From Swiss-Prot:
Role: Probable rhomboid-type serine protease that catalyzes intramembrane proteolysis.
Name of this protein: Rhomboid-type serine protease 2
Main location class: Golgi
Source organism: Kluyveromyces lactis (strain ATCC 8585 / CBS 2359 / DSM 70799 / NBRC 1267 / NRRL Y-1140 / WM37) (Yeast)
A Pfam family reported for this protein in Swiss-Prot or TrEMBL: Rhomboid
GO cellular component terms given for this protein: Golgi membrane
Amino acid sequence: MNIKQFFVPAGKPLSGLAVGLSIFLTALFLVNNLVYPINEHLLLKPDSLFKFDLNRISLYPLAHLSFFHLFFNVISTFSMIVMFEESHGTLYTGVILNLLAVFTAIPYCLIGSLLFPNVEIGGASGWFFSFLGYFAVKESRVRNSVMITSTFSFPTLYFPVALLFVTALLAPGSSLPGHAIGLLLGYFMGLKENWVAKITPPSFVLKKIETWVDPLINLIPFGIKYYREVEVDRSLEYTSVYLGSESRLPLHNTDTPAEPTFQGNGRVLGN
């Protein structure tokens, strides 16, 4: 697998939301530590749902508690957002990020009010697990397993679950319930993406919004791509993030050597 493709698809500029969000998260972290403790108004509390505190319910992914917390979340979510944004559009991806935050917060608050009423959470790692679950569903339809070593493979669909528990072991202070809820939402989004589309604004609304803010979109620097609604087609089939000869694996063993297959021009997700 070509890891570079996760960050900078060949011959393509960086995606606008992925870059902008990374910069914004960093700026908020600096403001919180140097200017004003903004995290006090962003961290999600289990009682936030019952107080109808919309700031905390939707904005808690923006709050980070340490530099390493910020660094690992920016690095892990960047590639996921790049891939999703390229195939779904910048504005639509922003809507999805907000929906994921809200629909993760609701069950977290319900569970947390009973089991851990005094625990606050923040950070974008829930987004990472949601997108990880989403891409695992899509990838599992192309590759049923991922090669870990030359002799050991792991089911593609359950790889995020393994990573969920590894993360809990390596970072015991992280929110396992929040990550698990985010992962379940990602699985749901991958399995029922047409259902998710029904709770997002219609395409014509997104196009209208982009028309209104077009002067601002045109200010985006060269080398950073804003994927407009008119440029994307969310009905296109998923393309594996694995490149070259690994892009498809057989689902069963065969005793006869496979005949050479035509190697067409591959494309990165969303092209």
